[in-house]
Amino acid sequence: MNLSPLHAITNVGVLLGGQASAWQKNLAAFGTDSYIRTQLENLIDAAQLKIAPVVREVSQIVPGGLTRLRQIIAAESADDIKPEEIDAEPAVSVPGILLGEIAAVTQLGQLGFTPEKYTAYGHSQGVLGVECLTELPGDNWADDEKLVNYVAFAFLLGAAASQATFGRMMSVQGVPVELLPIAPGVINSPIRAVYSGDSAELAAVKRAVTAAVDKYNATIDTHERGGEHVDVTFADLGVKAAFHHE
């Protein structure tokens, strides 16, 4: 099989993702590289030092959050890491996702695929990674002021989102987005969208979408239109904050 080397590929886009992703597995996989693991650990230390005046308050919002991040990074294998309830807390997931993206861009750079050779796009929280990673991290991440500042901000942002406890995220799958009676926060595909809000708001979305689906399916049963029934699936995305909430 003939594979083109990365540096020979042109017009490439790299997507940095956000919440409701397998960020724990990704971060753990990067941590199995001893060089990257050490860099991540030192970067976390530097970011914690940066927020030293408020670090105690931040750590009290989600006790054990920092320990969980260190546990993921120190895992011998990504298979050793299983999702835990604390992972849904933005205080853990927001810095965890950014740290994983820093590691990913570094590994691409080690292959000769540096940031100037591709266009980076951020989905959701991924915009933070795009802004942070306009160039390849240096030899010592803890001395890179830009990296330290962004990771420190991620810790503060995540803690603030966890403290606010203003909702969750729910996906709606199987329904053409044009049939949705309430505008979603994010559209992932023609038949998948994400809503954010508190429990009452998401329950209202479920009722409205279910009613719209029932009405649509009824028109098929009465032969007012052709086609197949629409089957809707609702799923909690395991994110304890209403990202994309308006």
Give the positions of each predicted feature.
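Alpha/beta catalytic cores of group-transfer enzymes, especially the acyltransferase/condensing modules
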Residues: 133-246
